[in-house]
């Protein structure tokens, strides 16, 4: 994959439910704590090195931000870092929360 793909929240939810992809949430800590997708990893400048060490780059990665804009830059960055299959979630957490309000966790993990 030379370029990331943009996917809808329904496709992201299906991939996550089937264990087909890792979900990375790039929103700020306060927003993440207020609500995030269960199982999402909070990706920050501080957690990025650990992700790079622990992830083989082969498992697909989905990037989520607030509305689907910032995730595009992060997805492109991850591709340049050697991740093979990267997706940006269209509409971000805002779209996820509207589509799947029952699938929102609170607090940090």
Curated annotation (Swiss-Prot):
Q: Which residues form the signal peptide?
A: none
Q: Which GO terms describe its molecular function?
A: thiosulfate-cyanide sulfurtransferase activity
Reactions catalysed: thiosulfate + hydrogen cyanide = thiocyanate + sulfite + 2 H(+); thiosulfate + [thioredoxin]-dithiol = [thioredoxin]-disulfide + hydrogen sulfide + sulfite + 2 H(+)
Q: Which domain of life is it from?
A: Bacteria
- Which example biological process does GO assign this protein? glycerol metabolic process
Cellular location of this protein? Cytoplasm
Under Enzyme Commission nomenclature, its number is 2.8.1.1
**Where in the numbering of this chain does the Rhodanese domain appear?**
17-105
> Which Pfam families would you find in this protein's record?
Rhodanese
Catalytic residue positions: 65
Keywords assigned: Cytoplasm, Transferase
Q: Has keyword Cytoplasm?
A: yes
Entry's InterPro entries? GlpE_sulfurtransferase, Rhodanese-like_dom, Rhodanese-like_dom_sf, Thiosulf_sulfurTrfase, Thiosulphate_STrfase_CS
SUPFAM superfamilies in UniProt:
Rhodanese/Cell cycle control phosphatase
EC class of this enzyme? transferase
Query: GO CC terms for this protein?
Result: cytoplasm
Matching PANTHER family: FAD-DEPENDENT OXIDOREDUCTASE, THIOSULFATE SULFURTRANSFERASE GLPE
Record family assignment: Belongs to the GlpE family.
What is the annotated role of this protein in its UniProt record?
Transferase that catalyzes the transfer of sulfur from thiosulfate to thiophilic acceptors such as cyanide or dithiols. May function in a CysM-independent thiosulfate assimilation pathway by catalyzing the conversion of thiosulfate to sulfite, which can then be used for L-cysteine biosynthesis.
Could you tell me which NCBIfam families the record lists for this protein? PRK00162.1
**HAMAP family per UniProt:** Thiosulf_sulfurtr (MF_01009)
Protein name, UniProt field: Thiosulfate sulfurtransferase GlpE
């Amino acid at each position: 994959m030379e370029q990331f793909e943009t996917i809808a929240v329904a496709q992201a939810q299906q991939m996550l439910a089937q264990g087909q992809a890792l979900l990375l949430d790039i929103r700020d800590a306060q927003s993440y704590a207020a609500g995030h997708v269960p199982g999402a990893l909070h990706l920050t400048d501080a957690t990025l090195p650990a992700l790079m060490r622990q992830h083989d780059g082969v498992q697909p990665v989905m990037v989520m931000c607030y509305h689907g804009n910032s995730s595009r830059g992060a997805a492109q960055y991850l591709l340049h870092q050697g991740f093979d299959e990267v997706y940006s979630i269209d509409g971000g957490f805002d779209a996820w929360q509207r589509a799947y309000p029952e699938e929102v966790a609170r607090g940090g993990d």
